[in-house]
Amino acid sequence: LSSSPHAAFVDVSADFETLLLVKSAEELDMIRYAAALGERACEAFAARSRAGALESAPIAAALEAIVSGGGWLGGPLVIERAGAQRFAWGKPEWMSMGRPRVLQSGDSIGAEIFAFYGGFESQQQIDVSIGRPGPLLRELEEVCAESYRRGAVKMPVGARFSQLFDPISQT
């Protein structure tokens, strides 16, 4: 800055972001394909989520679906959690704590999957219940559903999420 004392700096970040949002037909096709790969990954994840399976099996199936479809993986690849009372996301614990846990009836396993294609990323979030969901998961499901209902009633066309925060947070 000292070498350009008369320079004027102008914030163009909003205008630049607007330019980046415009996509060609080809770019939109790649974005749609990335999303389709992510959906295939979710199908593979759900198919491999069952009692007796290692929690790593659904993750492996999801990643295989992306790569075999011509996509690629970007960090963090996937964030995951499994168990009857585990509801936080993070890197899979078996990566630093040893053998993946064996899924049991009453568990749920959830993940956020990142599918890349043509330089574009899609993100899918999935949660699979192994057998009947336990009481805590059912209670959390009801809280989420009620929050959604309250927000949907208050949501005018063109609303911003910030306008929905109050009705949703009162659940």
Predicted regions and their residues:
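Active-site neighborhoods and metal-handling regions in enzymes and metal-associated proteins
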Residues: L1-T171
